[in-house]
């Protein structure tokens, strides 16, 4: 946290829609490598970022771990995350199975968070624009506030990004659609350009 603190004021003035700063591996890293309390880190971030909503990454029914947790644990965790400073929760399931996201969506919304449901992008014969649309439709029915195409491997090319985003915009109208990509394969810049 100490390395981040000096720039938090500057980050807060930029005007980000949200700042993803918690969840995923950051929670684990605090405990395993940094000897930090991840909850205390979150509270410190919130106290220094007054104008910028804080976002976290949540692995659906797995929360921040590597196994499924019961619904009552999911509810308690989502409540605690919002109480300690999280405003937006980006929820995903590595298998793109909405059933593994349903409880987290329900309890995050109940706690007052903006819920962004993310679909994990990959390339295979079964991962088509139509299959992603089917997952997105289920997530919208569950009450998500926005959608995200999560390309954590950097595999999404410009043409496919254009097709996916266009299809989602045509189907869901004004529902916000985010694209999250990594530069692993060198495609992200052009992919963002085409998606926009």
Model-derived features with residue positions:
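Glycine-rich phosphate-binding active-site loops on the catalytic face of alpha/beta enzymes
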Residues: 91, 151, 196
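Active-site/ligand-binding-proximal alpha/beta "capping" segment
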Residues: 157-173, 177
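A short, small-residue-rich loop immediately preceding and capping a beta-strand
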Residues: 89-93, 175-181
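Generic hydrophobic/aromatic pocket-lining and core-packing "Φ" positions
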Residues: 8, 78, 105, 136, ...
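Catalytic cores of alpha/beta
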Residues: 130-135, 139, 185-196
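Active-site beta->alpha loop and helix N-cap motifs at the rims of alpha/beta catalytic domains
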Residues: 18, 23-140, 144-146, 154-158
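Acidic/polar, glycine-rich intrinsically disordered N-terminal extensions of enzymes
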Residues: 1-19, 23-28
